[in-house]
């Protein structure tokens, strides 16, 4: 029971402490609020006193009328006039400040220009050009011309040196923007014309190239036809000529005696035909193969054959060649 009592006492003490703390905080906040109110009231009083002083000064500046009227309605009018006068004074002060600023700005500009001109004069000295102009004096009846020429010596060719003509020449040489635009238009037109001319030339060249290529093709075809015709005509012309085996040659005496040939000159193809006829007449073909020829004593002697040698249709020309070569060698020896 004692423990419960102590815990309840502690809780009561804690509650009382918290209530006291909250009361203290409230008193502090109320004091701070009252202090802030007092400070605000003091500030408002000071501002009001300052404004009243300003009004008094404006009354003295404005003249006698504003100083004599102190009624409630008159006080309003005085305030209005004082505000308008203050605005005028402020405007005048602003104008003075602006005028002083503009003067300073102009002075700075002039100082910069003078510094630039001095630097330019140091860097690049100005050359004054002088040009000679011959003036021919003409005697006119007018008094004005005489009066103008009284101060000029009329003896001989008078020479006057004029300065600063380059500027006039430059002004004359300067072209107006309209003239420049016209020149640009003319240049663009001339450029377009040249482009069109070049395109036309390219087209003409392309057409010419096509024509030339077609002519080349036609010539090539004609040449091929001529070659074909020449080959055909050459074959026809050379058909009567003899060459190789068809060429007539002197027949050896041994073959004449064997084949009973009366002509001295015959082609080798004709001689082979006579040889095959001789083989068939004498039944010299092999009955089994019918490709080999069984030679007799005369053929062996003619061709100079040995044991084991065979005559066929494939090696017939080699045996005949042997006979023709022996005949040619004998003729050379006789000569």
From Swiss-Prot:
**Domain SWIB/MDM2, first and last residues per copy:** 244-326
Q: Which residues form a coiled coil?
A: 181-217
What InterPro entries does this protein's entry cite?
SWIB_MDM2_dom_sf, SWIB_MDM2_domain
Q: Does the keyword Coiled coil apply?
A: yes
Stored PROSITE patterns = SWIB_MDM2
What's the domain of life for this entry?
A: Viruses
**Entries under Gene3D superfamilies matching the protein:** SWIB/MDM2 domain
Q: Carries keyword Coiled coil?
A: yes
Its transmembrane ranges are: none
Q: Which Pfam families match?
A: SWIB
Q: Which UniProt keywords apply?
A: Coiled coil
UniProt lists compositionally biased (Basic and acidic residues) regions at: 83-109, 163-173
Span list, region Disordered: 1-182
| Comp. bias intervals (Polar residues) | 60-75
For this entry, the protein name equals Putative SWIB domain-containing protein R508
Taxonomy of origin reads: Viruses, Varidnaviria, Bamfordvirae, Nucleocytoviricota, Megaviricetes
